[in-house]
Swiss-Prot record:
Pfam families on file: Rhodanese
Organism: Corynebacterium glutamicum (strain ATCC 13032 / DSM 20300 / JCM 1318 / BCRC 11384 / CCUG 27702 / LMG 3730 / NBRC 12168 / NCIMB 10025 / NRRL B-2784 / 534)
Name of the protein this chain belongs to: Thiosulfate sulfurtransferase
GO molecular function: thiosulfate-cyanide sulfurtransferase activity
Top-rank taxon: Bacteria
Keyword Repeat: yes
All residue ranges annotated as the Rhodanese domain in the record: 31-138, 171-289
Annotated gene: thtR
Reaction equation(s) it catalyzes: thiosulfate + hydrogen cyanide = thiocyanate + sulfite + 2 H(+)
Enzyme category, top tier: transferase
Keywords in alphabetical order: Repeat, Transferase
Database matches in InterPro entries: Rhodanese-like_dom, Rhodanese-like_dom_sf, Thiosulfate_sulfurtransferase, Thiosulphate_STrfase_CS
Length: 301
């Protein structure tokens, strides 16, 4: 049974306020039937030094990725994961994590690949919860299996792949590419991208024609999302009706921007190219541009 929506007034201006919850809303409902909380961090060990009471850990690297192929787990493995974590198909799942929900948004996105209908993000993530000095726990909960069904992953409308991104470069009116990495990564000065990802590449730069919109500009210093007016200004150069594809280094930061565009601003046609620069920058004879962004210089600070 789905949990009620958070009526927090600031969320009403977003396109899909049902996809985001506040710390106060979640704190009042921890342990409620039909509500499961998932912590998913860039630093997986943070869970061990204190987490939301009743929250389970999903490690993006170990739990969501196929151990052999560079791809996500299949429906059978996802169902097994859900059953280990005690998550039912009709549960409301609230995901949170460190670094302004960087990897939490990625985990939410993977849930959506398997069609889990009610997945929400905790505004501000782990840092906001801790900053408000809310309850934490060291107890790792054990839940009974919820008999989660095997549902095969559906990539269509959520993922973009290298062949179609490459093909769009020669098409008139093709996809709008948004590079959500830092300006130094986009320009090619930092060819290795995020230094914590351990994902070096052979070439630096960006996909030709891409717009650089750093994912972190969408959040405030405390990790909370900016207001609708600020986000509209930040993404003013994008058309919600266009085929929009976001990318970063390995798809993690892009998932955060995907969430902003889809659920906070109401973009209907936004996908994540999760192969991202780790794939593009290592492939032979791929077109690459370097240099600073010239298409969008909006500041909302």
């Amino acid at each position: 049974m789905a949990a009620p929506f958070d009526p927090f007034p600031a969320f009403e201006e977003y396109a899909h306020p049902e996809r985001i919850v506040s710390a106060s809303w979640l704190s009042a409902r921890l342990g409620s039937p039909g509500l499961k909380v998932v912590e998913s961090n860039e630093d997986s060990l943070l869970y061990d030094i204190g987490h939301l009471p009743g929250a389970v850990r999903i490690d993006w690297a170990k739990d969501l990725n196929d151990p052999l192929t560079r791809d996500f787990i299949d429906g059978e493995a996802f169902a097994e994961l859900m059953n280990r974590k005690g998550i039912a198909r009709d549960d409301t799942v609230v995901v949170y994590g460190d670094k302004s929900n960087w990897w939490a948004a990625f985990t939410l996105w993977v849930f959506e690949l398997f069609g889990h209908s009610d997945v929400r993000l905790l505004n501000g993530g782990r840092d906001a919860w801790m900053a408000e000095e809310r309850d934490t726990s060291y107890v790792v909960p054990e839940y009974p299996s919820a008999n989660y069904p095997v549902v095969e992953r559906v990539d269509e409308n959520q993922r973009a792949f290298v062949a179609e991104v490459l093909g769009s470069l020669t098409q008139s009116g093709g996809m709008t590419l948004v590079d959500v990495r830092t300006p130094s990564e986009f320009s090619g000065l930092d060819e290795h991208g995020n230094p914590t990802s351990n994902t070096g590449v052979l070439r630096g730069g960006h996909i030709p024609g891409a717009i650089n919109l750093d994912w972190s500009d969408a959040v405030l210093p405390n990790g909370n999302f900016r207001t609708r007016a600020e986000l509209d200004k930040l993404y003013a150069d994008l058309n919600p009706a266009d085929d929009t594809v976001v990318y970063c280094q390995v798809g993690d930061r892009a998932a955060h921007t995907w969430f902003v565009l889809k659920y906070l601003l109401g973009f209907n046609n936004v996908r994540n190219y999760d192969g991202s620069w780790a794939e593009w920058g290592n492939m032979v004879r791929m077109p690459i541009e370097t240099g600073e962004n010239t298409k969008n210089n909006v500041s909302v600070s």
